[in-house]
Swiss-Prot record:
Zn(2+) 2 binds at residues 139, 141, 166, 171. Its EC number is 2.3.2.31. Might act as an E3 ubiquitin-protein ligase, or as part of E3 complex, which accepts ubiquitin from specific E2 ubiquitin-conjugating enzymes and then transfers it to substrates. The lineage of its organism: Eukaryota, Viridiplantae, Streptophyta, Embryophyta, Tracheophyta. GO terms for biological process: protein ubiquitination. Members of the RBR family are atypical E3 ligases. They interact with the E2 conjugating enzyme UBE2L3 and function like HECT-type E3 enzymes: they bind E2s via the first RING-type zinc finger, but require an obligate trans-thiolation step during the ubiquitin transfer, requiring a conserved active site Cys residue in the second RING-type zinc finger. The active site probably forms a thioester intermediate with ubiquitin taken from the active-site cysteine of the E2 before ultimately transferring it to a Lys residue on the substrate. This is Probable E3 ubiquitin-protein ligase ARI3. Belongs to the RBR family. Ariadne subfamily. A zinc finger (IBR-type) spans 190-254. The gene is ARI3.
Length: 537
């Protein structure tokens, strides 16, 4: 380990033996990572009751700048996925008429005055209908109210409220919202409005529902910060990746994490184990495991076969040979497949064990965190010492431990795919792969060693120490906390610049490293409202 990162005295520099438990039934650690709050958040949480206000804020902006009605503004925004900048760019480059046409809007054509008292509906083909039961859309097409109601009812019930087209053949015009509300029942109108409101989330690349289960009812709006992938924290406490909506997983890319979770959940490695440790009976094809040294295998179906080559044989044999049988030619392809299965199994086991070990540590350290915070608060109230009155050095160290432990756990799935052949087989030569692997593992090892030291020091009973020893512990913790933070930062820089940088990022963008942890979204509040921000510090 480099001298730059050995900044502790001997008492705090001893290595702790790793003793990770391996429980067959485990789940991800559900721990509070103390989400960061900021007055300049890169995300906002929009609660269910604020969705209308959030949508209205953008609608008003478009209505004022383009001089359009609310329903027209909403239709435009839905078509352009609520991307106001893109909408204004199309308006500037192509003009209003072209923009309207693409979105399914028409410039209103004044209705011609007619003296006819009765009219014909071209949908139901009814003649002699009174003009007052006929409704005309802005595109100019007119049909009877019963046909319109039937059309609207079907579309709303099918979930197509956001873009209900005119019934006329090949007409691409969107039906007026006010007309829809006027003709359908109040219950259906409420459902229609709910779909229009939810469109702000479901058709908006910058807003997504919180994936909490059960659903907390809130949505998260990402504020443009130059990063394609970000990790956010909802007010309900859930922290997740804004891009793929899974749990926070950096430094893994979304694709890496998806593949890793699937690999952990499915039976791919079980199949590898069976391939390595069993042979198929040549008669019934059931897998047989060898339990002793004899190469003559006997299946439950009664078939005898040779363990070495898998060929069917008779039962007469000695310890070293089978009567009337000699193994055939060297099965080169079969041996290669077996060796590959063994290699893949060993590799997966290596990375998964270390990934799981840090997850297990994270669970145990959650209990440690609670105990430490209780001690710090208790001492700040009972001891007249300045160091106890200001115990941010303890909470900072605990938060740093959790942030770095999570990063460490997910650095193993990253390494599994970064230096394997599944994703980047053709992106680098074997020599380049080995160089990059060594570079990453050196940084990973430095981070791992210092995180274990941090965990060990935090286990000390500082509430029993005298003032002088507490000050000494505070100095070491503060120093080590900064070291771990810097190592995390350097690991991310290595990944972004040295590992993924030379490769076209494509599907492998990662969320940026944030020294203070995943940022909690501030609460959206309409300008006219008097609410406060839950995420303000």
């Amino acid at each position: 380990m480099d001298d730059d990162y050995m900044m502790l005295d001997d008492d705090y520099g001893e290595e702790e033996d790793e003793n990770y438990s391996e429980d067959d039934n485990y789940s991800e650690a559900e721990v509070d990572l103390q989400p960061v709050t900021s007055t300049k958040s890169t995300s906002q949480v929009i609660k269910k009751e604020s969705l209308v206000a959030a949508q209205k804020e953008i609608l008003v902006r478009v209505m004022e700048l383009l001089s359009v009605k609310e329903n027209q503004a909403r239709t435009l925004l839905i078509y352009y996925q609520w991307n106001v900048e893109k909408l204004f760019s199309v308006f500037a480059d192509q003009g209003k008429d072209r923009m309207f046409s693409c979105a399914g809007l028409t410039v209103f054509v004044p209705s011609l005055v007619t003296s006819k008292k009765t009219m014909k509906c071209d949908v139901c083909m009814e003649d002699d209908l009174p003009s007052n039961v006929m409704t005309r859309m802005e595109c100019g097409h007119r049909f009877c109210n019963d046909c319109w109601i039937g059309h609207f009812t079907v579309k709303i019930n099918e979930g197509e409220s956001k873009r209900i087209l005119c019934m006329a053949h090949e007409c691409k015009a969107i039906c007026d919202e006010d007309v829809v509300r006027k003709l359908v029942s109040p219950e259906l109108a409420d459902r229609y409005d709910r779909f229009l409101i939810e469109s702000y989330v479901e058709d908006n690349n910058m807003v997504k529902w919180c994936p909490s289960k059960p659903h907390c009812g809130s949505a998260i709006r990402k504020i443009e910060d130059g990063h394609d992938v970000v990790e956010v924290g909802c007010s309900c406490g859930l922290q997740f990746c804004f891009s793929c909506l899974s749990e926070s997983h950096s430094p893994c890319s979304c694709l890496m994490w998806k593949l890793w979770k699937k690999k952990c959940e499915d039976e791919s490695e079980t199949v590898n184990w069976i391939t390595v440790n069993t042979k198929l009976c040549p008669k019934c094809s059931k897998p047989i495991q060898k339990r002793d040294g004899c190469n003559l295998m006997t299946c439950k179906c009664g078939q005898h076969f040779c363990w070495l080559c898998g060929q069917a044989t008779g039962r007469d044999h000695t310890y070293t040979s089978i009567a009337g049988h000699s193994c055939g030619r060297y099965k080169d392809e079969k041996v290669r497949q077996l060796e590959r299965a063994q290699r893949d199994l060993d590799r997966y086991t290596h990375y998964h064990y270390r990934y799981k070990a840090h997850i297990d540590s994270l669970k145990l350290e959650d209990k440690l965190r609670k105990s430490i915070l209780e001690k710090a608060v208790s001492n700040s109230e009972t001891k007249d010492q300045k160091v106890f009155k200001e115990y941010s050095w303890v909470t900072d160290a605990v938060n740093r431990l959790f942030i770095s432990r999570r990063i460490l756990s997910q650095s193993y799935p990253f390494a599994f795919y970064m230096f394997g052949e599944e994703l980047f087989k053709d992106e680098m030569s074997e020599k380049e792969r080995e160089i990059k692997k060594n570079l990453f593992e050196d940084q990973q090892q430095q981070l791992e060693g210092n995180v274990e030291k941090l965990s060990k020091i935090l286990e000390e009973p500082f509430d029993e120490y005298d003032h002088e020893k507490v000050v000494e512990m505070m100095r070491h913790l503060t120093n080590l906390t900064a070291v771990v933070d810097n190592l995390c930062k350097e690991m991310y820089e290595c990944i972004e610049n040295e590992l993924l940088g030379p490769i076209q990022f494509g599907n492998h963008n990662i969320a940026p490293y944030r020294s203070k942890g995943i940022e909690q979204a501030t609460e959206f509040c309409a300008e006219s409202s008097d609410c406060g921000s839950s995420g303000s510090s």
